Each structure stands twice: as C-alpha cells, then as structure tokens.
Amino acid sequence: MNLKKKKVLVVGAGRSGLAAVKRLKALGARVILTDQKEPDQLSGILELGLPDGQLVLGHIPQWHEVEAEVIVLSPGVSPQLPFIQEGIAQGALVWSEVELALRDHPAFKIGVTGTNGKTTTTTLIGELARRTGKSTLVAGNIGVALSDQVENLDEEGIIVAELSSFQLELVDSLCMNVGILLNVTPDHLDRHGTLENYLAAKARIFEKQRPSDCAILNWDDARVRELAPHLKARVVFFSPTSLLAEGYGVQGDEIVLARDGKITPIIKRRELQLRGNHNLENIMASIAAVRELGLSWEEIAQGLREFKGVEHRQEVVGTYEGILFINDSKGTNPDAAEKALYAFEEPIVLIAGGKNKGLDFHDFMKTVKEQVKSLVLVGSAAAEMEQAAKDTGIRHYLRAETFAEAVELAIAEAEPGNVVLLSPACTSWDMFKSYEERGEFFKELVRRHYREPI
C-alpha cells in the first residue's frame, strides 16, 4: 500500500509511536499524532517537526478530530478504544508499528512470539544469523522499534523481530518467512480477557504465511502443537524433553534433529552457557530458524557455545561472600518465574512481587513451596501473593515496603551457597518504568551492599 499523501493517525507517543511517525513522514504520509498525555509529559515530540494541527495531545480524542485512512497503534494502546472502533466502522485500517515497518520490506523475516523466552530466542537467532554474512536487524518488542531501523537494512538482509500479542492482534498483511511460537501460558489477561483470545493473538504470527514459509512450534505445549493442522506453512516441531520422530529433540545429553529416520547430533547440553530446561526451548527454536538460512551445523554449534544470554534474563550479577545473585527481572509472570526456580539446584531466596496482570498465583506458590528457602514479597501484588502463599501452606515469608528493603531482607536471609533470585512473577509498573529499570536497580543495590564500585 502506497502511503504517500495518505492521512495516517498514530496513537501513542512512546518509542514505537515516535518511530512510526518518522517512518511515515519518510514515506510521504500526512501524519496526525495523538496521546492522552500532556506535551510536557512526553519526550521527543518537538524533534518530529509536526505542526500543532497534526498533534492531538492531552486527552482521548473523538474520531472527527483525527479522521484517517490508516491507524497505527502503539503496543500499549487497546484497539477497543471508542474512537478507534469508530474509525474501524468508517473503514480505516488498523496496523501495529511492526506492520508498518515490515509489510512491504523484501528482507527475509523471522518472527518470534510466545509468553516466555521471546527476547532470548530473538537475540540468539540474531547472533546466529549474523554468521551468514548478511546484514541483520534484531528489533521489535525488544527495545528497538523496527520503524527506526528498517530503512537501514538492505533488501537481501535478515530481520529478526520479537512480537508481542499486542502487536500480533493487529496483523493485516504481514507475512513471516519463519514464524516461531515458543509457548503459551496465561498472561496479559487484563488486555485479552481469556486465554483463548490471548492464544488467538499469538497464533496470528502464522496467519499470512504461505506453503513455502516455515512455522516452528513447541511440541510439548499442547495448545501450540494443536495449531499445526490449521497452518498453511511447513511445520517444524521441537521438544526440550523428548526425542521426536520428526523434529528437534533431546537424546541423552545431546540436542538432535530427527528427520527421515536419521538422527543428526547438533550440540551437547554441557557445552551451552544457558542454564535451565526452559532455555532448551529457546535454543531449539533458534536452531530450527537459522537452518532455514542455510547455516551449517558447525556454524550453529559454535554460535551456541559462545552465547551467554540476555541482560535481565537469569543474568548473573555476581557472587558475593559465597552468595550467587541472579537478575531475572524479565520474569514478569508466574510461568517465567517458575522456570527460573527450576534452573538452580542451590537453595533459593526469592524476591517476588510488583504489579499483577490479572493472573492467579496459587500454582506458582506450590512451586515456591518446593523450590524456595525464603520468600520476600514486595510491590502492589504483595498482599495477593501473601494470601496465595498462606493458602499453599507457606509459613515463612517476609514483606518489604520498598524494593531496596526487599533486597536487604533477601541478603539477610541468604547464606553462602545460596542463590538470591529476583524473578518477580509480576510487571514492574507499580514501582519502575520498565523491567530493565528494575533489574538495573537490583544490580546497583547488590553492588552497593557489598561496596563494589558501581
């Protein structure tokens, strides 16, 4: 779709929205930007060079104020807002910023989604893809807006995009050459309402694929596996727990590919730097994706040996006085935090809490009871988590009023040979702007406690 001189409304003036405006201006569109925040609460607006008539700020607008042919939504904006619904009724197209950036780009596109593991998988695929020698862009829901970067990528390049359910629910014509669905567990139910709606949003990563494209699915996740018969693309399965008849699996200590009755060994688990069974999901999906790029087994294995992981995902902060500190601030739901608990054999002091996303903590607390030595709760969800802990029979837990107090309590509970793990099972939005800010503050507090230079 040629956007030159088309009227396009961008909703949300955060990172994605500002990137979308810049991209649209480069494409010759007539842009209107709206955000309910006041101008002094927003940064980067002035640099866009939009006249006042193309800025609608400080309130949720009526459709007649912002009428457009295309609406581009930032990830945090619900398409159910009345003015957006009125626009849809009037025939406006609704896109995500990712759709805007990628829909007409000829590069090879790899999309990664799932409840947990997206960022690690996306980053790992990007690292491996660069071994092809082609220009590679890693972006999406991972800190870099695609619209900011895509014009710098040549037509023969590779795009690896982390895609959230918010971005995927707005798929219009976006087609991924390789689409990956890692797993689906309850998350963002405050936005999607039901698990079925959430799964449907995730599954849209495959909606526009063709028979020549590839869909990579987790065999061990029944909800994901059952999508296979409904997909147009060629399906490749992986299983982090078993040897499949066809697909990527495990045999003893090795990750292998089973195909046409032949077993191909790829790499031994002990050669990997990433800990935890859940990381096998990320690794296997990454292997399957980059095989579509033509990488050899040795090139893949060498890349896997060198990959150390991603900041804020079970990141090693350091060992102080015999205590290992792990920053898993990206563990923003119970399933992610539960996987982190199973990654360590040492006794764990867990810091959990933050802002809940409408999720239940009872099953999570059953795992906490089995795996955790001491539990420290903090944040707006602390009372809810405390009740779930009581209901599960956990008697020893601590409540902190501030995040700094939570870290000090955890250190006091820990002994040499223990792990202090920040894996909150909640978002950061009650105390911090992002999980990154929370993770950085955790690292700062730990280093400050042990008087290490920051």
From Swiss-Prot:
Checking InterPro entries in the record gives: Mur-like_cat_sf, Mur_ligase_C, Mur_ligase_C_dom_sf, Mur_ligase_cen, MurD
Keyword Nucleotide-binding listed? The answer is yes
Which GO biological-process labels does this protein carry?
A: cell division; cell wall organization; peptidoglycan biosynthetic process; regulation of cell shape
Q: Which domain of life is it from?
A: Bacteria
Keywords attached to this Swiss-Prot or TrEMBL record, sorted alphabetically, are:
ATP-binding, Cell cycle, Cell division, Cell shape, Cell wall biogenesis/degradation, Cytoplasm, Ligase, Nucleotide-binding, Peptidoglycan synthesis
Positions of ATP binding: G114, T115, N116, G117, K118, T119, T120
Catalyzed chemical reaction(s): UDP-N-acetyl-alpha-D-muramoyl-L-alanine + D-glutamate + ATP = UDP-N-acetyl-alpha-D-muramoyl-L-alanyl-D-glutamate + ADP + phosphate + H(+)
Query: In which pathway is this protein known to take part?
Result: Cell wall biogenesis; peptidoglycan biosynthesis
| GO molecular function annotations of the record | ATP binding; UDP-N-acetylmuramoylalanine-D-glutamate ligase activity
- The EC number of this protein is 6.3.2.9
Any one annotated GO CC term: cytoplasm
Where is this protein localized, as stated in its record? Cytoplasm
Q: What does this protein do?
A: Cell wall formation. Catalyzes the addition of glutamate to the nucleotide precursor UDP-N-acetylmuramoyl-L-alanine (UMA).
The entry sums up its family as follows: Belongs to the MurCDEF family.
Report the protein name in the record. UDP-N-acetylmuramoylalanine--D-glutamate ligase
Q: Which organism is it from?
A: Desulfitobacterium hafniense (strain DSM 10664 / DCB-2)
Q: What is the lineage of its organism?
A: Bacteria, Bacillati, Bacillota, Clostridia, Eubacteriales
